[in-house]
């Protein structure tokens, strides 16, 4: 088995937490204990690659930079992505190594600060189309003030009701390919557990001469994870989130869980609008892409059900 695991934001920071380093390390230890359970069941020629989100960490870092800009210059979003990749990669790497060592396993683990290619003419870069919320939720007055201070920002209402329903949104371009694919393939081939494409990867565009340049954007981590799955020739794509299964008719009286379905059914349900754009939508879309590429199985489930889901006992299981 060649397995690509995509960790959700709750694997590193819970919604109710402030996001201290201590809190995040605790969450990483919970997460990597489950990953160690997976590794301990793997055969010698099996491979594991891990990717992760960075939404809360990147949002907090952007707030810190905004508050401190009078003393030190704020950094661009590609730099913020690189910084949080290093932060989260370090925490996951250390925690996983510790659990594997306790089990007598000495599989090398490495975290890679990784670039992902996007198109400079992606529609997300133009007009008011930017769709990825970042930073804190704001009141309408706070949103107006932010727009006054930063006329170049796009600030949108992201929830239909409530007091704090406004957020800054940034471009979320479609990932095209993984810039560091050859290095990652070699490490995976050597039996190393690789943590890569964190937070969707650092968004870069090609300058046409073999050079790359970072851009102000945030790539969806599940879609970038699917591109990473292609790079490492994964046969199984496991997306871990905060629910055991995806749902049809979410939030309605006729809501129902999605168990084992085919690729054709997944495409049908997605086209019917069952999966929301800001949550389950990109996950299902990533699963569809993976199976269309040639993957064998895509799974969506919760962290605590990961091993059961890999054994086919729970989760939303999508096959071609």
Please give the residue ranges for each predicted region.
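C-terminal catalytic "cap/lid" subdomain
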Residues: 1-320
């Amino acid at each position: 088995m060649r397995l690509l695991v995509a960790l959700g934001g709750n694997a590193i920071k819970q919604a109710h937490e402030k996001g201290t380093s201590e809190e995040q390390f605790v969450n990483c230890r919970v997460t990597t204990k489950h990953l160690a359970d997976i590794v301990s069941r793997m055969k010698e020629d099996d491979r594991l690659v891990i990717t992760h989100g960075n939404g809360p960490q990147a949002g907090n870092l952007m707030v810190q930079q905004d508050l401190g800009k009078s003393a030190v210059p704020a950094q661009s979003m590609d730099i913020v992505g690189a910084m949080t990749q290093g932060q989260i990669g370090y925490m996951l790497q250390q925690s996983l190594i510790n659990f594997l060592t306790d089990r007598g396993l000495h599989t090398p683990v490495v975290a890679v600060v990784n670039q992902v290619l996007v198109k400079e003419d992606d529609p997300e870069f133009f007009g008011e189309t930017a769709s990825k919320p970042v930073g804190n939720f704001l009141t309408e007055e706070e949103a107006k003030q932010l727009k006054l201070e930063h006329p170049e920002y796009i600030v949108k209402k992201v929830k239909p009701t409530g007091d704090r329903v406004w957020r800054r949104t940034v471009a979320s371009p479609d990932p095209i390919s993984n810039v560091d694919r050859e290095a990652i393939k070699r490490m995976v081939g050597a039996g190393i557990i690789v943590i890569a494409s964190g937070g969707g990867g650092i968004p870069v565009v090609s300058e046409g001469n073999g050079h790359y340049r970072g851009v102000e954007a945030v790539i969806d981590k599940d879609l970038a994870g699917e591109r990473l799955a292609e790079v490492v020739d994964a046969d199984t794509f496991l997306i871990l989130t905060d629910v055991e299964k995806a749902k049809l008719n979410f939030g309605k009286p006729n809501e129902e869980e999605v168990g084992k379905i085919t690729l054709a059914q997944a495409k049908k349900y997605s086209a019917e609008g069952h999966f929301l754009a800001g949550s389950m939508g990109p996950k299902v879309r990533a699963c569809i892409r993976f199976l269309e590429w040639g993957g064998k199985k895509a799974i969506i489930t919760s962290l605590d059900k990961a091993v059961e889901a890999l054994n086919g006992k729970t989760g939303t299981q999508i096959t071609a």
